[in-house]
Amino acid sequence: MSVDISTVKRVAHLARIAVSEEDAERMTGELNAILGFVEQLNEVDVEGIEPMTSVTPMKMRMREDKVTDGGIAAAVVANAPVTEDNFFVVPKVVE
């Protein structure tokens, strides 16, 4: 798959990004290089290879789940203009 300048402009338009003509030409080359690398990765034989979740063989340390109030309710509502019992108070918007 290769990207041409019209594809770059179309994607930029869809993303609502302003792209100049010279930037679009530069991006065309960069995107084609990226897609070429991805195509190389698709050719790698990974049959029998276990998926990795980390590059190190460490296991995640587990801790016991404890239900708490978090202890920061007052800090969370500290900058709110109006609060009541550590809750935000907002104007009624639905009748």
Curated annotation (Swiss-Prot):
PANTHER family (UniProt xref): GLUTAMYL-TRNA(GLN) AMIDOTRANSFERASE SUBUNIT C, MITOCHONDRIAL
Keyword ATP-binding in annotation: yes
Keyword check for Protein biosynthesis: yes
Role noted for this protein: Allows the formation of correctly charged Asn-tRNA(Asn) or Gln-tRNA(Gln) through the transamidation of misacylated Asp-tRNA(Asn) or Glu-tRNA(Gln) in organisms which lack either or both of asparaginyl-tRNA or glutaminyl-tRNA synthetases. The reaction takes place in the presence of glutamine and ATP through an activated phospho-Asp-tRNA(Asn) or phospho-Glu-tRNA(Gln).
Organism domain of life: Bacteria
Family as reported in the entry's similarity comment: Belongs to the GatC family.
Keywords carried by this UniProt record: ATP-binding, Ligase, Nucleotide-binding, Protein biosynthesis
Name the UniProt record assigns to this protein: Aspartyl/glutamyl-tRNA(Asn/Gln) amidotransferase subunit C
Catalysed reaction equations from the record: L-glutamyl-tRNA(Gln) + L-glutamine + ATP + H2O = L-glutaminyl-tRNA(Gln) + L-glutamate + ADP + phosphate + H(+); L-aspartyl-tRNA(Asn) + L-glutamine + ATP + H2O = L-asparaginyl-tRNA(Asn) + L-glutamate + ADP + phosphate + 2 H(+)
Gene3D superfamilies (alphabetical): Glu-tRNAGln amidotransferase C subunit, N-terminal domain (1.10.20.60)
Annotated GO MF terms: asparaginyl-tRNA synthase (glutamine-hydrolyzing) activity; ATP binding; glutaminyl-tRNA synthase (glutamine-hydrolyzing) activity
Organism: Brucella melitensis biotype 2 (strain ATCC 23457)
UniProt-listed Enzyme Commission number(s): 6.3.5.-
Disulfide bonds: none
Quaternary structure annotation from Swiss-Prot or TrEMBL: Heterotrimer of A, B and C subunits.
UniProt-listed SUPFAM superfamilies: Glu-tRNAGln amidotransferase C subunit
A GO biological-process term: regulation of translational fidelity
